[in-house]
Amino acid sequence: MKNKRSQNSPYITNSPYATLEKALGYSFKDKRLLEQALTHKSCKLALNNERLEFLGDAVLGLVIGELLYHKFYQYDEGKLSKLRASIVSAHGFTKLAKVIALQDYLHISSSEEISNGREKPSILSSAFEALMAGVYLEAGLAKVQKIIQNLLNRAYKRLDLEHLFMDYKTALQELTQAQFCVIPTYQLLKEKGPDHHKEFEMALYIQDKIYATAKGKSKKEAEQQCAYQALQKLKEVK
């Protein structure tokens, strides 16, 4: 039985991804490409989303960089870099991914399910990058730009430096100095992957107690994720 489309909708109504595609604002012509974008490497399948993630990282860096360049013409390179860093990160892409409930559609291993893998920023942000790569391959850069603009509008009440960027490490250090008279420390737990696609796992300690662990494409990104988690635990970030 063939998939059916409703008369007034471009989305296949009995497709398992119809709701996702509607939230995204794009219907994939090749559902296998969509499947691949949603498949994490933990599934041990021949096709997973790692290659698409690689492409999506480059596409999103360009799209978001251009968007910020045109929107914030009064900002210098330093401010633009801070804005971009807050969006082009595991935390930033996870925020956009959750707007479309991407976590509900991921294909992950049973062990990742047990460890709450659907909520891990490293997994969710990678899937988001892969998904955008899929859109780019089928529909081009303009469609990705339109989707990202829409998701940013839905994810953030205001898109500016004050509301979008926060240096979580600085905020955490100020808080721990005020509350505990100490500063947090960071330790590298693991480093893996080839030079062009590294992944770092960092741990954050306060008074010799581990408060958070996180992964990122750089030590700085992983440390920011750790700081964000610690701030949440300390009720500083809601």
UniProtKB/Swiss-Prot annotation:
Q: Could you tell me which residue ranges the RNase III domain spans?
A: 17-140
Reaction catalysed by this enzyme: Endonucleolytic cleavage to 5'-phosphomonoester
Any one GO molecular function term: ribonuclease III activity
Provide the top EC class: hydrolase
Does Phosphoprotein appear among the keywords? no
This protein's GO CC annotations: cytoplasm
Has UniProt tagged this entry with the keyword Cell inner membrane?
Answer: no
Principal cellular location given in the protein's record: cytoplasm
SMART domains listed in its UniProt record = DSRM, RIBOc
Q: SUPFAM superfamilies given for it?
A: dsRNA-binding domain-like (SSF54768), RNase III domain-like (SSF69065)
Q: Which GO terms describe its biological process?
A: mRNA processing; regulation of gene expression; rRNA processing; tRNA processing
InterPro entries, alphabetized = dsRBD_dom, RNase_III, RNase_III_dom, RNase_III_sf
Per its UniProt record, the required cofactor names are:
Mg(2+)
Q: Which keywords, in A-to-Z order, does the entry hold?
A: Cytoplasm, Endonuclease, Hydrolase, Magnesium, Metal-binding, mRNA processing, Nuclease, RNA-binding, rRNA processing, rRNA-binding, tRNA processing
Q: Residues that bind Mg(2+), according to the entry?
A: 53, 126, 129
The lineage's top-level taxon is Bacteria
Active site, per annotation = 57, 129
Pfam families for this protein: dsrm, Ribonucleas_3_3
Tell me how this protein assembles.
Homodimer.
Can you tell me which family this protein belongs to? Answer: Belongs to the ribonuclease III family.
NCBIfam families the UniProt entry points to = RNaseIII
Query: Any idea what this protein is called?
Result: Ribonuclease 3
Which source organism?
Helicobacter pylori (strain Shi470)
